[in-house]
């Protein structure tokens, strides 16, 4: 199983729920259908993720953990934003920050630098170089 791909799927699910208001339980149920069809919604410049390498249990744990601790995670993010309000963040950046903040706080088996590096890579892929720098700065303040 590939943790990088699993994080990417988790981030996409977080983004999807943030964008359309769907709850995370529904998104996890839909993931089963997505996995069976081997396709995640493709957007311009998004690469498809091969779900056979994705650790679905890890994705579920992350998604459920974020949902259960969302207020605490968002407070941690807010406390490390400089001259920004969480409401102004792009949905992609917010999803990446929530994912990594959860890992930093609750996934003790993952080194902080690995979580932050993965968040930066997700930002480069889905948001842009400036967002990657911004996310690195916010997460760097957390550790």
Curated annotation (Swiss-Prot):
Q: Which UniProt keywords apply?
A: RNA-binding, Transcription, Transcription antitermination, Transcription regulation
Q: Which Gene3D superfamilies match?
A: NusB-like (1.10.940.10)
- GO molecular function terms attached to this record: RNA binding
GO BP field:
DNA-templated transcription termination; transcription antitermination
Which SUPFAM superfamilies does the annotation name?
NusB-like
Any one cellular-component term (Gene Ontology): cytosol
- Function (record text): Involved in transcription antitermination. Required for transcription of ribosomal RNA (rRNA) genes. Binds specifically to the boxA antiterminator sequence of the ribosomal RNA (rrn) operons.
| Record family assignment | Belongs to the NusB family.
Q: Would you tell me the protein name for this molecule?
A: Transcription antitermination protein NusB
Q: Which organism is it from?
A: Clostridium botulinum (strain Kyoto / Type A2)
Its lineage reads: Bacteria, Bacillati, Bacillota, Clostridia, Eubacteriales
Q: Which gene encodes it?
A: nusB
């Amino acid at each position: 199983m590939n943790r990088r791909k699993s994080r990417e799927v988790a981030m996409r699910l977080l983004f999807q729920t943030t964008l359309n208001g769907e709850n995370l339980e529904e998104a996890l149920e839909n993931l089963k259908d997505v996995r069976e069809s081997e396709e995640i919604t493709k957007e311009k410049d998004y690469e498809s993720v091969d779900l056979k390498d994705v650790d679905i249990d890890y994705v579920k744990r992350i998604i459920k953990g974020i949902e259960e601790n969302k207020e605490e995670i968002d407070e941690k993010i807010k406390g490390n934003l400089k001259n920004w309000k969480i409401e102004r963040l792009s949905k992609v950046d917010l999803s990446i920050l929530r994912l990594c903040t959860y890992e930093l706080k609750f996934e003790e088996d993952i080194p902080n630098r690995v979580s932050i590096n993965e968040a930066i890579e997700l930002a480069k892929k889905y948001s842009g170089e400036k967002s990657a720098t911004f996310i690195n700065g916010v997460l760097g303040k957390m550790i």
